[in-house]
Regions:
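Residue-level signature of catalytic and energy-coupling elements of molecular machines
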Residues: 74, 138, 154, 210, ...
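Conserved ATP-binding/catalytic core of the eukaryotic-like protein kinase fold
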Residues: 150, 160-165
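Glycine-rich ATP phosphate-binding loop
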Residues: 140, 150-157
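ATP-dependent phospho-/nucleotidyl transfer catalytic cores
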Residues: 86, 92-100, 112-113, 166-167, ...
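N-terminal accessory/targeting segments that precede structured cores
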Residues: 1-137, 143, 163-194, 198
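An acidic- and aromatic-residue-enriched active-site/binding cleft used to recognize and process polar
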Residues: 157-161, 237
């Protein structure tokens, strides 16, 4: 119970920091009691985000700070303008899943534990992280196929991320069950949102699902010359490690570059 309260307290204080409590206050019946309650838990001296920051951006910033489960929750909520409104949904649609990377040495430790082999017997030129998100991060490396050297990207789950997610989801279940006792929160269907978030994250915590989906997509599009799916190197895939062919390209959100090319 104490751990759940501390979890709730953390959420309140982060929401206060980004002025999100004001948005909640607008939509509840007992505004004065809510204001007193949140003031006691999160004093006015807490830092706040700029008041002219769009609501969706403030919500996204808070979710990023709260952790991986909240980031995934925000990405799901952003697809429901019927619940949060079009303007907030549009602002949250670009919610970035970016976090500081964990060290190369930690990544090597995870790989060696997964394959029970030394890193040098698996990969050549295993580099520093080039992209990091809430669930996993990516390193460039090379593998050897006979005399051929193949550039690859290696995706690795964050250390302890499975335990972290399970703990966060347990506490989110507790919180949503508590909030749905209040009529103001019933229409948000929080329990169904949390259930869907849990399903999405479950697949992301086992990289073999992603590898299988990529392999199936490659098979289904093999006759389409305008579409290319990188190869999955299955001998270098485990629950926590995914190895995929490295290719050059333009990110889908770089519209100007795509038009130029």
């Amino acid at each position: 119970m104490i751990a759940n309260f501390l979890f709730f307290l953390k959420i309140i204080r982060v929401f206060k920091k980004y002025n999100i409590l004001i948005l909640i206050e607008k939509n509840i019946r007992y505004k004065f009691l809510f204001k007193i309650f949140t003031y006691l838990l999160a004093p006015a001296t807490f830092n706040k985000s700029p008041k002219d920051m769009p609501d969706g951006i403030r919500i996204s910033s808070a979710l990023n700070e709260l952790g991986p489960s909240f980031i995934k929750l925000g990405q799901l909520i952003s697809t429901r303008p019927d619940i949060i409104g079009n303007e907030i949904a549009e602002d949250m649609a670009m919610l970035r899943d970016n976090l500081p990377p964990f060290s190369r040495n930690e990544a090597i430790k995870i790989i060696e534990e997964q394959f029970d082999k030394d890193i040098d017997s698996l990969f050549q030129n295993f580099g520093e992280p080039i992209a990091a998100a809430s669930i996993a991060q990516v390193h460039f490396a090379e593998i050897k196929d006979g005399q051929k050297i193949i550039p690859v990207a290696v995706k690795i789950l964050r250390p302890n991320i499975i335990e972290t997610i399970e703990d966060e989801m347990y506490r989110l279940d507790w919180l949503t069950n508590f909030l749905e006792n209040f009529s103001e929160f019933e229409r948000l269907q929080l329990n169904s949102v949390i259930k869907k978030t849990r399903e999405i994250i479950r697949f992301e915590l086992d990289l073999r699902y992603e590898a299988a989906a990529a392999s199936e997509l490659k098979e289904n599009t093999k006759d389409d010359q305008s579409f290319y799916v990188p190869d999955i190197h299955w001998e270098y895939v485990t629950k926590k490690v995914l190895t995929i062919e490295r290719i050059n390209g333009i990110p889908a959100d770089k519209i100007d570059q795509l038009i130029e090319n």
